[in-house]
């Protein structure tokens, strides 16, 4: 592994390292997963400022029976406003003149996708697919005008967790570079004492009758 340490990180470098492991260990099957925090410059909504958003990403290579497959995993952090709560807040204002605010919360979508052989899918591509699906990504640089713009964006895109999962799936299904995938959407409720979670899969790769009991705890992003 260390002889590849100075190379620019890519699936190709991972493949070279995996080949070395297979040769050195005389192994039939092998798996290599690399996790990283990827910095991407993101512009604020209204003030024109920008800063770095850090994305939890993992690349994975799996070889079984002589067949090699590539996977990418992304945690996309966004804000979700409850559609029901939004309507109730508006009703309180219009019916009783009572100021009310809808509940919203930090939410996380973990997108796990298979990259089709011969195709190029990179971090920015998967991040952009997530943004297209649910545009209320948490912000990096925030002035008052950005906070107002974010409030407007959330009000224009209220969403239940099931609908968020469907929107992510819609984007992934529409990209020919992506094969099997799994979407886990977790809305970490500010109203309820439990989180709302939705899981959708496409294909057999991520389908399972059992889920790791610690999986959902890893979706907490305290940043």
PLM regions: where:
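N-terminal intrinsically disordered, cationic/polar leader segments
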Residues: 1-223
């Amino acid at each position: 592994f260390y002889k590849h340490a100075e190379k620019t990180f890519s699936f190709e470098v991972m493949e070279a390292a995996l080949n070395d492991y297979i040769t050195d260990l005389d192994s039939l099957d092998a798996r290599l997963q690399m996790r990283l925090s990827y910095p991407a410059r993101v512009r604020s909504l209204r003030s024109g400022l920008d800063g770095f958003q850090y994305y939890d990403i993992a690349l994975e290579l799996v070889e079984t029976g002589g067949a090699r497959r590539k996977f990418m995993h992304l945690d996309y952090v966004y804000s979700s406003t409850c559609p029901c709560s939004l309507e109730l807040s508006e009703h309180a204002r219009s019916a009783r003149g009572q100021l009310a605010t809808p509940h919203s919360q930090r939410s996380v979508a973990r997108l796990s996708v298979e990259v089709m052989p011969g195709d190029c899918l990179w971090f920015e591509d998967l991040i952009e697919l997530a943004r297209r699906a649910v545009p209320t990504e948490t912000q990096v640089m925030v002035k008052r005008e950005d906070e107002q713009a974010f409030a407007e964006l959330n009000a224009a895109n209220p969403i239940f967790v099931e609908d968020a999962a469907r929107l992510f799936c819609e984007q992934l299904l529409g990209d020919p570079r992506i094969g099997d995938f799994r979407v886990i959407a977790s809305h970490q409720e500010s109203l309820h004492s439990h989180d709302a979670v939705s899981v959708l899969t496409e294909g057999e790769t991520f389908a399972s009758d059992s889920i790791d009991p610690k999986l959902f705890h890893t979706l907490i992003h305290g940043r």
